[in-house]
Structure formats: structure tokens, C-alpha cells
Amino acid sequence: MRSAQVYRWQIPMDAGVVLRDRRLKTRDGLYVCLRDGEREGWGEISPLPGFSQETWEEAQTALLTWVNDWLQGSEGLPEMPSVAFGASCALAELTGVLPEAADYRAAPLCTGDPDDLVLRLADMPGEKIAKVKVGLYEAVRDGMVVNLLLEAIPDLHLRLDANRAWTPLKAQQFAKYVNPDYRARIAFLEEPCKTRDDSRAFARETGIAIAWDESLREADFTFEAEEGVRAVVIKPTLTGSLDKVREQVAAAHALGLTAVISSSIESSLGLTQLARIAAWLTPGTLPGLDTLHLMQAQQVRPWPGNALPCLKRDELERLL
């Protein structure tokens, strides 16, 4: 016998969270909980403002329609990426497809203070990997900060994310301030330039490896082995169903590319599922999930070891 609940929620964010020039004061989303007999499965639907095509309200309408269809016996999935992902996660839990084992390591997000990063990395098992957002300030400053971190911590590898912020000139200004001897320890730089061609040229000219992120969601993108391209960053909330995520991971691995499962600032419930997806589909690759510290609370399922308060399901607003 099938049954379902849908919950709507809103989590206050820390004051300094800015996405594409917009301050994110709250993270808004939905949960779906599906039941079939004794089995239960949860999924999170939280479109990311400025990145997702769909709004929270559109996702809510699509989710409620899909849940009602599912209760009538339908087996399809919604079209909207965030709704497709959340619904497919709930189904994967319900049917036991999504393994329980999780990779709760997360590449720490670094603000540029090497002393702070040294402390955070000290507790990190395995290879020392951190992530730095670049492109928010002057390219020269970014280059100096990255160089300082790599110089201060000799076994550190950095993942950098520019979100297509730079012109070719700005990208070159950044590279100029990174010692060529340290560049091999830049694991990859996500989307340095506004166009893929400019990003490819940057990789060839500087020897700094790049990764595709936004490009994966563009209609003309195809997976291919290219000089200077080392990785793809997959954000399931922006990608779509679990099957689509699996297809992208498989396509990347077939070309020898690293596939990194990455957060779209989901709640703790969604992040714990992404940690399970990472352990399942990209074992051995550190996922990019260090975003819970941007929030003021956890919900339903806490992240292991995190001290933030965790709201229970009966504290959420129920829609269905």
C-alpha cells in the first residue's frame, strides 16, 4: 500500500552567503517521504536560486503532481532536475538501490587563512584537499592567496572554482601569481573563463588543469577527452534523476576523468544522501559537500559529528 508525505521548509543562512551577486538569506526546499508497506524513502527537492531553471514554487507544484501520480501507481519521474533528483532518491531508498555506506569526508572550503586551513586539514584522513572560491575579488589577489596556501602546506592539493568569472586576461593575471612549481598541486580549476574555448586555452597556456561544471548542463555539451581537462563536477540537484547522475559519472570515468559529486547547498538530509551517492558512484574521490556550515540548523537527518541543532520531521510544515 503506497502512501506519501510532502514537507516544506526554510532554513536561515549565515549572513555572508552570496550566490551570483544575490544574498541568500534562507535556503528553501521540500522533502518527499514515500512509503510502500514497511519500506520508506526520503528525497530532498531544493532548487538553487540563480542556478536552477525552476523556482521553489514551480518545484512544489511539480512534486505534488508527481506524488499524486505515484500514489495511483505511476512509475515515471518528473522533468524538472531538482524534482527528478529528489523523487529518484526517495524511490532509491524505498527500493534499497541507494546503499547506506557514505563518504562523510568533505573538501573543506577555505577562505584564504592558511593557519585555519592547517587546523582543519589536521583531522582529515588521507590526502589533503581543500577548495577555494576564486573570481570574487581581484584575480591578482586570488593568485597570491592560492600561492600562499600551496607554499605554506607542502602536501596540499587545491580545487578552485571560478564560476566563469574571468576574462582571458584576468585568468592570466591569476596564473602569473601562482608559482609554476606549485601548479601541479592545483587538482583542477572549475570553469575559469566565460566560454569553454577560453577555458581550454587557459589550461593549455598555463598547465593548470580545469574542470567542467556549468558546462555539463548546457545543451551542446558532450563528454570527450581534451587536453588540460581533468575533472567534471556533478551537482545532482541541478542535473536531474539519479540515473542521469550515474550516466554522467560513467561517461567521465570512461574517459579517465575524475567525477566529483558536489553540493548545491542542500540541507543536512540532502547532504547525507549525496555522501552516500559519492561513496557508491565515485569511491575514493573526495566529494564537494562542505556547505552545512553556511546554515543555522540541520533537519531530519544530521551530518555525523556536526553540532548544529537538528529539527525533526514533526517540526516541518506538512503539505501532504
UniProtKB/Swiss-Prot annotation:
It is an enzyme of class 4 (lyase). It catalyses: (1R,6R)-6-hydroxy-2-succinyl-cyclohexa-2,4-diene-1-carboxylate = 2-succinylbenzoate + H2O. Mg(2+) binds at residues 161, 190, 213. SUPFAM superfamilies: Enolase C-terminal domain-like (SSF51604), Enolase N-terminal domain-like (SSF54826). It comes from the Bacteria. It holds the Pfam family MR_MLE_C. Keywords: Lyase, Magnesium, Menaquinone biosynthesis, Metal-binding. The keyword Ion transport does not apply. Its cofactor is a divalent metal cation. Its EC number is 4.2.1.113. Belongs to the mandelate racemase/muconate lactonizing enzyme family. MenC type 1 subfamily. This is o-succinylbenzoate synthase. It comes from Salmonella typhi. The lineage of its organism: Bacteria, Pseudomonadati, Pseudomonadota, Gammaproteobacteria, Enterobacterales.
